Amino acid sequence: MLRKIIRHLIHFYNRLRLRNRNFSLITNTCIGGIMYHELKMRFLSPTINCGIRDHEEFFTFCRHLDHYLSLPLQFIPSQWKYPVAELRGKHGDIKVYFTHYHSEDEARTKWEERKKRVNPDNIIILMDGDNCTTRQIESFNALPQQRKAIITMDEHPDVPSAWAVADPNYKQAQILEYGLWNQTIRWYELMDYVHFFNTGKIRDNALFRLKKKNRKTA
């Protein structure tokens, strides 16, 4: 019961603080859909409940976003229980894994429906990059979008768009898990993502972590 109350208060506080309410959040994992849901926002992005697992492909997708959003999905044989499709563009093919969809028709319908809602004047890029190399983190930082953040395991103080979990208890690929306050706080909530959505500036969430070493906050 206490956990439920705390989660409710966190969501209420975040919704109260949110001023930027028509942004399109482009992500490489399911993190975007969770954030939209917790903020009670309409999905203004096609990258909901799906993922682009190859980091280089995600960079290409973001770098040429208008081009790839203009392309139809081409579904390919999948070894998993969920559909997999490609966006076959002039800059290379992008493979999209529709992890939380049951059929190609469902995946295609939702992708097409949501990509029509994309706000080209309010694009935010958020990447789960805790297994990225330093070179890949720097490649992300070079993307043309002004508002972008990559979540990493370790500190990269010289990369303005990098935000690190930097917690000894954090394990790779757990960014969506509840790992703090007796399984009440998700790991990504250590980042003040509402402030990031509002301002484009990256900082720690002072509610859950007062100070982190070697982090330049904005």
Question: PLM features: what roles do these ranges have?
Answer:
Residues 35, 134-137, 160:
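Short glycine-/acidic-enriched loop or helix-start segments at secondary-structure transitions
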